[in-house]
Amino acid sequence: MHCTAVMDLSFRQAISGDLEWLFDTDKRTMRVAVAQVYVWDEDSQRAGFAKSVRQGACQIVTWEGKQCGFVHWEVEPDLVWLRMLCIVPDMQHKSIGSQAIAKVMSLSSRLKKPLYLHVLVCNRAAYDWYRKIGFVEIENDGRVCTMMFDSSSPSGTVGQHG
């Protein structure tokens, strides 16, 4: 069931105390897809979250005080990278992802920099959703697809689907 009302989400900076929750959420949502393309390496995954938290590039998404996902992006000199958007399984399909990515799209627009992301080709639900909200495929090696947000696309608005 899709929620059509906008949820009152909050975003806060991830801190070192969030590392285990970030890792667990990533593992629950992404392990199967990652293992289809790469070897799942828990040490590498944990190290990646520790680095993103140290750099201040990861935000926890909360709704009614409950952690329901996280979004990780990096601003580079000529673009914005959406490194990861992850919503806990029981909170998916409630527009949380749509609102979280809208925050990053707004940042990209304000900075006048294109928004890029990588999506695993085997993660068809994510791939299809990114296409639906206006991302275009610019590179695909059969395992990982690089996509860019095309703000001129007629479908380049975030609907209530994520």
Model regions: which residues?
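A short beta-loop-alpha structural element at the N-terminal edge
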Residues: 9-24
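Conserved GNAT acetyl-CoA-binding A-motif
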Residues: 108-120
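Conserved acetyl-CoA-binding loop-helix of GNAT-fold acetyltransferases
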Residues: 93-106, 128-132
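Conserved GNAT-fold acetyl-CoA-binding loop/helix
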Residues: 24-51
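Conserved beta-strand in the GNAT
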Residues: 66-74, 81-86
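Conserved beta-strand-loop-alpha-helix junction that forms the acyl-donor binding cleft
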Residues: 89-92, 117-127, 143-150
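A short helix-loop-beta-strand connector motif used in the catalytic cores of GNAT acetyltransferases and
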Residues: 50-60, 69
